Structure formats: C-alpha cells, structure tokens
A protein has these predicted regions:
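Membrane-helix interface "capping/anchor" motifs
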Residues: 29-34, 82-93
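Small-residue-rich segments of transmembrane alpha-helices in multi-pass membrane proteins
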Residues: 41-51, 73-75, 95-108
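Alpha-helical transmembrane-segment detector that highlights a single hydrophobic TM helix
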Residues: 59-86
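Alpha-helical transmembrane segments and their membrane-interface exit regions
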Residues: 73-78, 121-131
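Hydrophobic alpha-helical membrane segments of integral membrane proteins
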Residues: 90-95, 113-118
C-alpha cells in the first residue's frame, strides 16, 4: 500500500470517526448503553476494514469484507437490545450502530459526501423526530392522560419502547 494511499485512508478514518461521533453524541445524551465511543469505534472500524479491502487487496472481492462487516455489526447490535418484562429496549440504539457502520463503509469507499449526508439524515431522525415523538406523548389526544387511546396509562400503547 503506497504512502499516498495510507494518507488517504488516514483522512477517511478521521472523517468517519468525526461523523460517527455526531451519532454517538446523540445516543450518549440520551444515556443509552452504546454511546459516543461505541459509535466512533464502529464507524472507524468499518471504514478501516472497507479501505483495507480496497487498497491492500485490490484483486480480491471486497464485497465479502462488506458483508462480514454487516454480519458482525448485527451481532453487536443484538447485544445492545434487551427485554424487561413486556418491553423491548434500545432498538433505536442498535439501529444507530448499524447505520454508523454503513457511514464508515461509505467513507471508506471514498463516498465522503454520501457519508456526510447520511450522518445528517441520521442526526435529524434521532434528534428532531425524538422531539416530535416527545410532544405527541406530552399532549394526549384522547383525554385519559396517556395519549394512546387504550386506557392502560403507560403512554406506549402496546407495552414496548423503541428507544
């Protein structure tokens, strides 16, 4: 691997780390199990694996590395999700880990603009839509105080949570 390619990959690693930091900060702010460091490590690792598969082994099929990244992140995400009584927790955090790997992979292939746009989209989904969801539960629509219309009083309707 040439020194120029190594400098390029180094830049990609820094960019992936910074982009994934934005996603991780949002999860950290919500006091989730996987926060800043986890998201940065996942994105940086996915970027490095992707870049290495392209630059270090140019004749090989780099899609095998990409598919294995996705599989590995699936196991990591499954470890974040937990269930207590009738509620499932941290599905959104698991999904954010998954998309963080995709952001790292995009940057690792040189699709920096796609990585930046994806990060901003994820940030919008996590941050802005969270506030819309919070307001929905803050102002009930059925008059019984829970905002879900089923009368169970927990505000979640089916007893599950996606955060």
């Amino acid at each position: 691997m040439s020194i120029e390619a190594q400098f390029l990959v180094s830049f990609q690693l820094l960019l992936a780390s910074l982009l994934c930091m934005l996603v991780g900060l949002e999860r950290e702010r919500r006091h989730k199990n996987a926060g800043l460091r986890t998201h940065m490590l996942v994105g940086t690792g996915a970027c490095l694996f992707t870049s290495l598969s392209m630059y270090a082994f140019p004749g090989d099929d780099s899609s095998r590395v990409a598919s294995n990244i996705v599989t590995g992140i699936g196991f990591l995400g499954a470890g974040v999700i937990y269930r207590s009584e009738d509620r499932v927790h941290d599905l959104t955090t698991a999904a954010s880990i998954w998309i963080t790997a995709a952001i790292g992979m995009a940057v690792g292939t040189g699709a920096w603009f796609l990585g930046i746009v994806s990060t901003l989209t994820v940030w919008f989904i996590l941050r802005v839509l969270y506030h819309i969801r919070s307001r929905k539960h803050q102002y009930p629509q059925n008059g019984n105080g829970n905002g879900n219309g089923n009368g169970n009083g927990n505000g979640h309707g089916n007893g599950s949570t996606i955060d």
